[in-house]
Amino acid sequence: IENKKIDIVILCLGANDMLRGTNPNIIKQNLKQIIERFQEKNITILLAGMISLETFGNKYKKSFDEIYPELARKFRISYLPFLLDGVALNPKLNLRDGKHPNALGVRQISINLEKKLISLLKKD
């Protein structure tokens, strides 16, 4: 990002970390550092959130699910609560692995992002 003209970035990280059971505090700290770097460069951020599966228990899920709204509030950035809304766990919208979206799933993700992005583009 050092020598590039970037106006807006969609930040959505942490899903694979969640699937591996990474400590939510580590995920949050990593996202925080990324957000701070983008804000230092005056780059507008759309934080696209994820929601934890219950694989690692309720305590883990609660901690993970709080990451994205907390960071959005703290840094006053635009926030989409769940990037995969309508896509996650829908076999018709995912590849055989059940975790990654197929072409139709990507289309739904684009729809999920559209209103937030249009709103951000109008601000610039």
Question: What spans do the regions from the language model cover?
Answer:
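Alpha-helical cap/lid subdomain in secreted, periplasmic
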Residues: 1-124
